[in-house]
A protein has these predicted regions:
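Non-catalytic signal-transmission and effector/linker regions of two-component phosphorelay proteins
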Residues: 1-20, 30-33, 54-57, 61-62, ...
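Conserved acidic carboxylate
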Residues: 23
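Two-component/phosphorelay signaling modules centered on CheY-like receiver
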Residues: 26-44, 132
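Acidic catalytic/metal-coordinating carboxylates
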Residues: 47-51, 76-79
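Active-site residues of response regulator receiver
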Residues: 69
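Receiver (REC) domain active-site loop signature in two-component systems and cognate sites
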Residues: 72
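Hydrophobic/aromatic residues positioned on beta-strands within the core alpha/beta folds
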Residues: 96-98
């Protein structure tokens, strides 16, 4: 009998968790999706924080994790976190940015579970996603 295939970069213990990917750069959405989808995560991508917020509000159940860029048009990743946490206070987030560092959170009440600086390696993303989901 064949054993199930598990990607050597991840544990494979994600049970099809739903992840929202939010970034205004389509190539980065495709990259993150290509890294996470083969591990069994269900992925929904959004090119704007407002679109992700609309989907979040309309969803029957919230995503397990929202991975969002910080700097986007009209609404930042921190704005998205704050709006989602008003609805679902325990919503898990991973903030990704190439323009700010983790010190951005000291200025406000909203904190993601983790921060990942761009550019990142596949293993860094996988490890952080697994760590956030394990919390």
């Amino acid at each position: 009998m064949d054993k199930p295939k598990v990607n050597s970069l991840g544990s494979g213990q994600n049970n099809g968790a739903l992840i929202y990917l939010v970034d205004d750069e389509p190539m980065l959405l495709e990259l993150a999706s290509a890294i996470l989808a083969p591990l069994g995560y269900r992925i929904e991508t959004f090119r704007a924080a407002k679109a992700a917020l609309r989907a979040f509000k309309a969803a029957e159940a919230p995503p397990t994790l929202i991975i969002t860029d910080y700097e986007m048009d009209a609404m930042t990743g921190l704005d998205l976190m704050e709006a989602c946490r008003q609805i679902q206070p325990r919503q898990k987030f991973l903030l990704v940015s190439g323009t700010v560092g983790p010190d951005i959170f000291s200025a406000g009440p909203v904190r993601p579970v983790r921060f990942l600086a761009k550019p990142y390696q596949s293993k860094q993303l996988i490890d952080l996603v697994e760590a956030v989901l394990a919390d």
